Amino acid sequence: MSRKHLTARQQEIFDFLKHHIDTTGMPPTRVEIAREIGFKSPNAAEEHLKALARKGYIEMLSGTSRGIRILINNDNEDVTQDLSLPLIGKVAAGTPIMAIEHVESHYPVNGAMFNPNADYLLKVNGNSMEKIGILDGDLLAVHKTNFARNGQVVVARVEDEVTVKRLEKKGELIYLHPENDELQPIIVDPRLKYIEIEGIAVGVIRNNAWM
């Protein structure tokens, strides 16, 4: 597919989008784009995003948290493909997330919605991550991995329980931070308590977009 060339500023924003997704697992907000690029207003970021969408480099999604989808990879190749991802409901204590009894159904998505790729969708229970737009009933797209960087939103298993939180490693301790001012972080000493990273969040599908 032939695409129009980007201006220097559009290329800068496009590169930031890809870098932010690679490092955090999610697209940036308009405010984050404006702060990074030096715009005075998020509206300026919005206009450049619309230009990127018109030129075929991204798609702006409704019903999706941080609704930006990259349409080409670093080699300027199309990455769109249809997938059917398992939808995971409530995870029983001490059992693998992908156990067959947890799969409620399969949900069709376009593979380009998520970078890195999503391996499954996890139904969100509660509002512990509401400040970053992950709400009760949403579907959290998860990339399976045991490695995560500080600041990424992870699916973590602490003892027998699975939780979605923002990761911070500090010294010997691991902090799992909620994005809700009414809740406290989970603090884990891996020497005393079992903890494993089971995946990183790579996107969100709003509950009213699939229910």
From Swiss-Prot:
Annotated DNA-binding residue span(s)? 30-50
Disulfide pattern: none
What domain of life does the native source organism fall in? Bacteria
Annotated site, Cleavage, chain positions: A93, G94
> Is the Transcription keyword given for this protein?
yes
Quick one: a GO biological-process term for this protein?
SOS response
Q: Which family does it belong to?
A: Belongs to the peptidase S24 family.
Function, as annotated:
Represses a number of genes involved in the response to DNA damage (SOS response), including recA and lexA. In the presence of single-stranded DNA, RecA interacts with LexA causing an autocatalytic cleavage which disrupts the DNA-binding part of LexA, leading to derepression of the SOS regulon and eventually DNA repair.
Q: What is this protein called?
A: LexA repressor
